[in-house]
Every structure is written in structure tokens, then in C-alpha cells.
């Protein structure tokens, strides 16, 4: 398993870091087999897996439950788990308690928090307590209501400078990496140049230190709207629906199960049970 120091070395060597989300055992197992460097158990599971309209309803218990499954599927991959909405805002004590639960109960290697300003103090407190923290700036889904929807952030000089300053504060507070979402490619490149920690982009251009995408988005699985920054490498949803429809048809036509899928009893046992009569 890679350690957090390995990601610093990858940045220094110019080797892109590959991160993908996973929310359950099979997806984590496949991600590890594919050779990803990091897995993010994102609170996006609220929308992707649990069917919520946003990430807001997701709880610490949800994150622990899903991370435990991911750890079982990917025992040798560095796992980052989101701290969900309002689990690190009320007080440092509450943030520490929730982070402790995630780290101890789920098997995560690090936690991720969104935003800057007052969150920077939480990053510092968690780091001081020995919890590795990944920061998340740009489009932060937990704050989408405040941001006015799912929009590109940092498009003008003033807001871009604010994001760059925020990133530097997160780094100074002890963050081990930064997820940068939905910003102009120029800002992504500047962040990667000016920060010593790895900058992992999602819609932040190609010149950052790594990329992260949502598992279901890149595989075309259960998604209705694909963000501009997503490249779909497959469309397994169509394959799944076709397979299920074929199963339905076969059962309705009594074409499944076939002899190859059934079990038989020895004739003498059948005679002993029913006297040779059909049951």
C-alpha cells in the first residue's frame, strides 16, 4: 500500500496520481485490480448509491459503513473518506470525535474536508491529533446551496486568488493533499506549481498532479447527467439493462433455468419418495 509520503514523491517525480471513488466491496476490488493509487469514499455516495438529491443527508455512520466495505475490497490501497456535512463544523472536539470514529472503525487512511476559512482550523486540529487530512476546494458539493449550484469556481481574478490563498492556508495547516474541483485549467496548473502537496483535480485541467472521477460516471453506470469534465470509458448501464431484460424474458418463456442450471435426484430415490409418480 502506498503511504502519504509516496504521493509527495509522485508529485516531485511528475507521475500523475490516479484516484477513483468506490462505495462498496465489488467496486473497490475492481479499482484495486485496475491499479488505482487512491480510493475516495466520497459523500457523493448519497446521490450515487443512496438516491438522495444531494450529499447533505449523508451521516458519519453512512461513511463508516461504506468505507468498511471498500477496505475489505481494497486491502492494499490508500483510502480517503469524506467527513460528511456538519460533521466537522460545530467544534474541534466534534470534528476530532467524528474523525476518530472514521479512522478507527472504517479502516480509512485519511479523511477529506471541504472548504477553507474556519475549516482551516479544523485541518490544523485534526493534523495535530495525527489524522491525515485531504482538503477540498473549488466546487464543494456540501456548500452547493451557498455557491449557487454546480458551477465552475474561480473564473475571475478575485475569486481565483481567494482559492489560491485558501489552498496555501490548507497546506500550511497540514493537509496532505488537495482535491480541486471544477475550476479553470489555468488555476489548476497554478495550484500544482505553487503548492508542495499533491493537487488532485476533478474538472481542473490536465496540469494538476492527479485526477479523480466518480466510479459510476466514468463507467456509465446509473447516471443520467454526465458533467463536462467526465470522460466515460464504458457504458455498462446499457449492458446491465440488456442482461436483466434477457433474464426477464427467459423466465417468462420458461427458457431459464436450462438443464445445465438444474439439479437431479437419483431415480431410485425419487421412486422411494413418490413411488415413481410425477410430483
UniProtKB/Swiss-Prot annotation:
GO terms for cellular component: cytoplasm. One of its GO terms (biological process) is pantothenate biosynthetic process. Keywords: Cytoplasm, Magnesium, Metal-binding, Pantothenate biosynthesis, Transferase. The active site is at residue 181. The keyword Cytoplasm applies. Its cofactor is Mg(2+). It is found in: Cytoplasm. Its EC number is 2.1.2.11. It is an enzyme of class 2 (transferase). Pathway: Cofactor biosynthesis; (R)-pantothenate biosynthesis; (R)-pantoate from 3-methyl-2-oxobutanoate: step 1/2. It catalyses: 3-methyl-2-oxobutanoate + (6R)-5,10-methylene-5,6,7,8-tetrahydrofolate + H2O = 2-dehydropantoate + (6S)-5,6,7,8-tetrahydrofolate. 3-methyl-2-oxobutanoate binds at residues 43-44, 82, 112. Mg(2+) binds at residues 43, 82, 114. Binds 1 Mg(2+) ion per subunit. One of its GO terms (molecular function) is 3-methyl-2-oxobutanoate hydroxymethyltransferase activity. It comes from the Bacteria. CDD domains: KPHMT-like. NCBIfam families: panB, PRK00311.1. Belongs to the PanB family. Catalyzes the reversible reaction in which hydroxymethyl group from 5,10-methylenetetrahydrofolate is transferred onto alpha-ketoisovalerate to form ketopantoate. HAMAP family: PanB. Homodecamer; pentamer of dimers. This is 3-methyl-2-oxobutanoate hydroxymethyltransferase.
Amino acid at each position: 500500500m502506498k503511504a502519504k509520503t509516496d504521493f509527495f514523491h509522485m508529485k516531485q517525480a511528475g507521475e500523475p496520481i490516479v484516484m477513483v471513488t468506490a462505495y462498496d466491496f465489488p467496486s473497490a476490488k475492481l479499482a484495486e485490480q485496475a491499479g488505482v493509487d487512491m480510493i475516495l469514499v466520497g459523500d457523493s455516495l448519497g446521490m450515487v448509491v443512496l438516491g438522495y438529491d444531494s450529499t447533505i443527508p449523508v451521516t458519519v455512520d453512512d461513511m463508516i459503513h461504506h468505507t468498511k466495505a471498500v477496505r475489505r475490497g481494497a486491502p492494499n490501497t490508500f483510502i480517503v473518506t469524506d467527513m460528511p456535512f456538519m460533521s466537522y463544523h460545530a467544534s474541534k472536539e466534534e470534528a476530532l470525535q467524528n474523525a476518530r470514529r472514521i479512522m478507527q472503525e472504517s479502516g480509512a487512511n485519511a479523511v477529506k474536508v471541504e472548504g477553507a476559512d474556519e475549516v482551516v482550523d479544523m485541518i490544523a486540529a485534526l493534523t495535530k491529533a495525527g489524522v491525515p487530512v485531504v482538503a477540498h476546494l473549488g466546487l464543494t458539493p456540501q456548500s452547493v446551496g451557498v455557491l449557487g449550484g454546480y458551477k465552475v469556481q474561480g473564473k475571475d481574478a478575485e475569486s481565483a486568488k481567494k482559492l489560491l490563498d485558501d489552498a496555501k492556508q490548507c497546506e500550511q495547516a497540514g493537509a496532505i493533499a488537495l482535491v480541486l474541483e471544477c475550476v479553470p485549467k489555468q488555476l489548476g496548473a497554478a495550484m500544482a506549481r505553487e503548492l508542495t502537496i499533491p493537487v488532485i483535480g476533478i474538472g481542473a485541467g490536465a496540469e494538476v498532479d492527479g485526477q479523480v472521477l466518480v466510479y459510476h460516471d466514468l463507467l456509465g453506470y446509473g447516471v443520467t447527467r454526465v458533467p463536462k469534465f467526465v470522460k466515460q470509458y464504458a457504458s455498462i448501464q446499457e449492458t446491465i439493462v440488456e442482461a436483466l431484460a434477457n433474464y426477464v424474458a427467459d423466465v417468462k418463456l420458461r427458457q431459464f433455468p436450462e438443464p445445465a442450471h438444474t439439479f437431479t435426484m437419483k431415480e431410485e430415490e425419487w421412486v422411494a419418495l413418490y413411488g415413481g409418480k410425477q410430483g
